[in-house]
Structures are given as C-alpha cells and as structure tokens.
Design a protein with these regions (language model features):
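Preference for the N-terminal adenyl/adenosyl cofactor-binding alpha/beta module
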Residues: 33, 68-321, 365-378, 424-430, ...
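SAM-dependent methyltransferase catalytic region
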Residues: 15, 158, 221, 246-544
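A short, conserved, highly charged catalytic patch centered on acidic carboxylates
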Residues: 1-26, 34-65, 70, 83-87, ...
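Short, glycine/acidic-rich beta->alpha junctions
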Residues: 7-11, 19-20, 135, 139, ...
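Short, polar/flexible loop-turn hinges at active-site or ligand-entry regions and domain interfaces
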Residues: 2-7, 25-26, 44, 91-95, ...
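Acidic/polar, low-complexity linker and loop regions
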Residues: 1-3, 100-114, 334-352
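Conserved, well-folded catalytic cores of nucleic-acid-processing
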Residues: 25, 237, 241, 386-389
Length: 545
C-alpha cells in the first residue's frame, strides 16, 4: 500500500470526520493489508495522530489468528445481528463520548450571541422581535450555503472568499450580494429580501469569525454527510432560547440569551427521537398510501399542526421519497426514466428520484403550522436540505446551475413553501379579536397569540374534505401552568368558549386533538404523542368519551 495506515494521520482523520459528522460510533479504515477501528464519538482535531481514538489495529499477517474475533465484531452477519453495536457499547465504557449534534449546537449558540451583541450594539432602531428574526436568518443562510458547498452544489470556499473581497468592501455587503444570487437560484424564501436584514450594520470581524469556523482546520465537520434529522434535533434545542435586551447603551443595547419560560418550566427542550418519528409515520402515512400509485398519492395532504423544527414532516417526506422510488423501480421503470421522474446516477449506478419529482412530492403532500416564526423557517430549511440530500454534482458546477452564473439559471432548485408551511396559532382564530375589549392588546401580545385562520390558510384542502393524515407531538400546557408558560386570561376564555374539551384544567394537547378532528377527512388517520394521564384523571372524562 502507498499509505501507511498505522502512522499516517490523514486517512484516519478523514474517516473520523465523516463518521463523527454522521453520528456513527465506530469507523473502520482498511486497505486489506492493514485494518484500524476507530471510536468516532471522539471529536477529531488537526493535531491528532493516526493512533488517536484508535480502538484496534491489525495487519494482514494477524488476520488468521484474530479471524473469529473480527468475524464476531465487524462481519456482515455481526452488523446484521447487532453484535457490532454490542462492540460499540463495550468500547463506550473505556472512552468518553462526544456527539456532533451537541458540538454544532454549541457552535450556532455561540454565533447567536455573537451576532446578537454586535447587531444590538450597532443598530439602535431594532427591537427584540426583529433582532431574533435577523440573527436566525443570517445563521440559516450561512449554514445552508456551507452545507451546499460540501454537497458540491456550490463551489467550495464560496463563503470564505467573501472575506477576501471584504478587504476592499464591507463583508456584510458582499454577503448580501451572495444572498441575492442564492435567492435567484434557490427560490426558497430563505433568501427573500428583508428590510431589516438589508439595513443592518454588522462588523466584519463578527462575520469572518463565524465563516472561518465553518472551514478546516477550525471546523472538523463534513457537512455533506450530516443527516437532516440531526440538524433538526440541533435546531429544536436552539429554538428553546430567545434573545433579550439587558440595558440601553449609547448606540444600541446589551443582550443576553435566555431559555423561553415554557422551556425552563419543562426542564428543557424534548426532541422526538427519530425512531419514534419513523414508527408513527409508518403507522399513519404508511398505512394511508399502501398500495397506492404516485398519481393517487399526489392528491393526498399530510399535516403537522405543531411542526416545531419539522421532525415529523421531514420523516413523512423521507417516507414518501422512498415509497415513490421503490414504486417507479417496480412498475414500468423505463417510463419513469423517460418522463424524468427518476434517473440513473452515473457514479453509484443506482436510480434516484429527480429533483423535479422531489419538488413535486414536497409541494403536493407536506403541510405544517407552528406558532413560532423561527420554527417555521427551520422546518422549511430542514425540508429543503432533505430535498437536496444526495444530489451533489448534479446541481453544482457543471451541473444544473452555478451560483455565480446567474444567466445560466434555467429553473430555481427549491420550491416556494409559503403555501405549505405557515406561521400561526393552530388553536386560536381571528375571532379572538371579536370582543372589543381585546383591542387593548399591544403588538407584543398580538405576536405572542399569533391568531391563525385555517379556513383562509388552507381553503382548498378543507373544501375538499380536509387532510388525509394529521401527525405530530403537540405542546403539553396545563392552564395551571399558564403564568409560567404565557397563557393569558383572554386565551383561556377563548378556549372555554370554542372547544368542547376545554373544561376544568385545560391542557393544550387535548385541544390540538379536537382541532385535528375537524381538519381531517372522514377516513383520515391521526397520530399524536401525548402523555398518558388522560386515562385516569377526572378532568379528561369527556376526552376519554
């Protein structure tokens, strides 16, 4: 072999970066003559040697004597039977653990505070609400473009090159131009023009430190292999905190980042584990589309009325993508290929859904609502990244479009999702303001309540009978917790007047169930994760009936 796997750190660092970013616990590096097994929960660094985090190392002459041990650990059968996982658990006892999601969460939380401090200090006109939105959008945009680079959809170092340009101009001005080009390319809403963003003053040092943190050697992540589901779990926790002003300064404000009151009361953010999402999706969407053709599925609508960062919608979308690909390969493959629904990847020699088909499925089938504007943007971002998953060069330079050749843009890659993913309070409609006494509510209170009219937002779907499936993990908020979780007296009165299940001590998850029953078709399928106390408590008698 031309590379010494025992001593050369480069192959080890590469495999560890990929595995760590994919949240894989173990990685195997081999050229057959040498074999090394690494614990990839240990974060790689540029200073690591080839031996760092290495659990085992063998050469060809030792394979025979260790054959049984190797077969029991890393053979196909061992992996299939779960013995590989057992080996990982054994190794876990000997070493500390680290996870890519915790690391990235800490990284973007640091960015949030850094950006918030800078913007609040140098932009006297901005308020807390718009500060939060602007910080979120900047982070989303930078992270999206960096992921696109590693997926080879964008040219590598596109973001970092803006720092070099910034030496003769303000870095933020260069980034705004880049965002405009990205908006023309992706059409996702993610890069839409924003008056507050355009007017901001941000110091070059702040932005350059964020961008440089996304590139080697400061960054050890391989963004192309980080699953969208992991990014969703990161953002779910990220959204559990808010930016608050602390003091007035000469030119702006001081800031802090604190937990939302409802998150603090609950003891933290709880992200729905991926395996639970998969199970619920299989038992609802899976049952609903079983045996159906793509044409039949195209008229179906699937909803999460409290979508958060989008875990259930991403899970639903993935299930639909897998189902369609399997269907096309099993039913008239040549026709599906001829009509552009699938294509054969020249590198892997496997069939994939075309971007156009993935766009069609996303816009036809996936719907969500959330009261938190930042959560809505994260849901869209997660769905867009899922659409772009495994695309790579097919969309990058020499492929469909190139970010800096705007005249070459034939079709924007991503669909607009404003008609599918909406921001609002799933439980409170505009009739909340019918009582004249409520007109005293200020802008901040109106933003918190965030009324939402289902009949207006999804008129065509409801006129056709409603959604085919409703799934999710709604908030559990008791009326007795209203002070800490922000449910005001007017909201409680509204619930009592408009929901049959709003009796005694209100719990919002029951109201979500009642609301969902009116949003579904008569033959629709419904599945929520809810606490089991409704089985025994007296206040849930009507709910049990």
């Amino acid at each position: 072999p031309s590379i010494d796997l025992e001593k050369n750190p480069e192959p080890a660092l590469q495999v560890r970066r990929y595995a760590y970013s994919s949240k894989m616990p173990i990685a195997i590096l081999t050229d057959f003559e040498e074999l090394a097994i690494y614990d990839t929960r240990i974060k790689p660094t540029p200073k690591d040697t080839a031996a760092t985090a290495r659990i085992e190392y063998l050469t060809l002459d030792k394979y025979v004597n260790h054959f049984e041990d190797l077969f029991n650990k890393i053979s196909w059968d061992a992996v299939d039977l779960g013995k590989f996982n057992t080996y990982y658990e054994t190794a876990k006892e000997k070493r500390g653990t680290a996870t890519v999601d915790n690391d990235i969460l800490q990284m973007i939380e640091d960015w949030r505070l850094l950006l918030a401090k800078d913007i609040a200090l140098h932009n006297n006109e901005i308020d807390e609400f718009n500060l939060t939105g602007c910080v979120q959008k900047i982070i989303d945009r930078i992270l999206f473009l960096r992921i696109a680079e590693d997926k080879e959809i964008e040219e590598l170092f596109t973001l970092q090159k803006q720092i070099e340009k910034g030496r003769s101009d303000y870095l933020y001005d260069n980034l705004k131009k880049l965002f405009d080009l990205a908006g023309a390319k992706y059409n996702a809403g993610l890069f839409d023009s924003d008056q507050f963003l355009n007017a901001l003053k941000i110091q070059d040092q702040t932005l350059s430190s964020i961008i440089n943190a996304l590139y080697y050697p400061e960054c050890q992540y391989e963004f192309s292999v980080i699953p969208v589901e992991i990014l969703g779990s990161i953002y779910e926790r990220f959204l559990g905190k808010i930016i608050r002003f602390t003091r007035k300064t000469k030119n702006g404000h001081g800031v802090e980042v604190i937990e939302k009151p409802e998150v603090k009361k609950a003891g933290g953010v709880y992200y729905t584990p991926t395996y639970i999402v998969k199970y619920i999706v299989q038992q609802t969407i899976g049952k609903k589309i079983e045996g159906k053709t793509p044409a039949e599925i195209s008229s179906m609508r699937f909803l999460d009325p409290a979508c958060g960062s989008g875990s259930f919608l991403v899970g639903t979308y993935q299930y639909l993508l897998d189902y369609h690909l399997d269907y096309y390969q099993e039913h008239n493959l040549s026709e599906a290929e001829k009509t552009g629904k699938i294509y054969k990847d020249s590198r892997t020699q496997t069939y994939k859904l075309s971007v156009e088909e993935k766009r069609r499925i996303l816009t036809n089938n996936i719907y969500g609502v959330d009261i938190d504007a930042q959560a809505v943007e994260v849901t869209k971002l997660s769905l867009f990244l899922k659409l772009l998953e495994n695309e790579g060069r097919a969309l990058g330079k020499g492929g469909q479009v190139d970010l800096f050749r705007r005249s070459d843009i034939q079709q924007r890659i991503l669909p607009g999702m404003s008609g599918n993913i909406k921001c609002g309070n799933s439980l409170i409609g505009s009739d909340y303001y019918d009582d004249k006494d409520l007109l005293h509510l200020g802008l901040q209170e109106q933003r918190k309540v965030n009324v939402f009219d289902w009949k207006e937002a999804f008129a065509s779907i409801l006129n056709q009978g409603g959604f085919d499936c409703v799934i999710g993990n709604p908030p559990y908020v008791f009326a007795r917790d209203s002070k800490e979780k922000g449910m005001n007296k007017e909201e409680k009165e509204y619930y009592y007047l408009n929901y049959k299940l709003a009796k005694y001590q209100i719990n919002l998850y029951q109201l979500f169930i009642e609301r969902s029953s009116y949003l579904m078709k008569e033959d629709g399928i419904f599945s929520f994760i809810i606490p089991n106390n409704w089985l025994t408590i007296n206040t849930s008698i009507d709910f049990r009936k």
